[in-house]
Amino acid sequence: MKNNILSLMLILIITACTSPQLEVTQTPPPATLEPTAITFPSATSTPEKIQMFNLISDDPIVPHGESSDWDSRYTDPGAVIYHDGMFYMFRNGFRDFPAESQVGLVTSPDGYTWTEQGDEPIFKTSDVAYAKIAMYASSALVMEDGSWVIYFYTWDSSSFPGSSVIGRATASSPAGPWVADPEPVLNLGAMGEWDAQQVLAPHVIQTTTGYVMYYSGANTSGAQKIGMATSTDGVTWTKYNDPATTEAPYAESDPVFQTGEKGQWDAGWVHQPRVFQTADGWVMIYRGTQNVKGEKMALGLATSPDGIHWARSDLNPVFTPHDIPKAAYIWYDNVLLVNDTYYLFVEGDVNQSTQIYLATTEGEITP
């Protein structure tokens, strides 16, 4: 019996050595002129982690200034807009935080190569009468009459979470001069409300019925959530209010996007919403943190059929500090959707100073 087994093993070994090896080839997918849809896996699937946004270069596209400049240590992408074939970035620059900040203008024909438009800021914190410490550009529009609008938020305390409100400034051209409205356009909620301490980081889009603003809001705990407001003229705003909630912290208004469940990567904060209305619905890129201290931040993706009810992507997080070489943190970001390409402009923190990097993804984002 033992001899039979040994003979069988010898035959198998000889067969394996003399059989031709199977060659594995990979055939590239056929080229297509249609945009590739980025789809969400089902709740029961376990997809491999994919890189949604790809950094176009390890180097920043917009650096901070020299040691003696107004933006010598920090710069972020502030408000970014694509208009008449040109990219405009109203970037924030500052030397410390929290400290006075200024807004500079850079432009680009393609989103990749940027040119500074003058050495000096075009809009300053001192131009906003009610800004106590700092003012940060956050969103921009070009109105039907050709006027330009920047929506900004203030930082009014050296403590955390500092009080902040949302304001608006206008100009006849992107270079200014910029004139801030005398009063904020979106104020804090009443004491005890979810946004009683901060309203900040607005993103405003124009729709067929008017304007929609998504913004971050926080109470004294500092835990930020995402709210929504609507307007017919871009000046007077009404916060979204779910009539089913009648007690604080949701008596006056309600967030449309809450923090993630305990233990999730975005369980601490969800903020800095960047929202787009597409043919298939609404898309939001947002920043999340694991705890209320703002640690372990990353960017997430969510979609909605109506701009109010949102579903997180199973691909989250879609961008982290590790995606920028040597970056310890990612702070402020902005996103543009131009011709089926999402341009992600992100403030990367390397060696305790920040510069602006670019990552992109192409194709439709669908539920």
PLM regions: where:
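Ser/Thr/Pro/Gly-rich low-complexity linker/stalk segments immediately outside membranes or between
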Residues: 24-31
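Bacterial N-terminal signal peptides
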Residues: 7-15
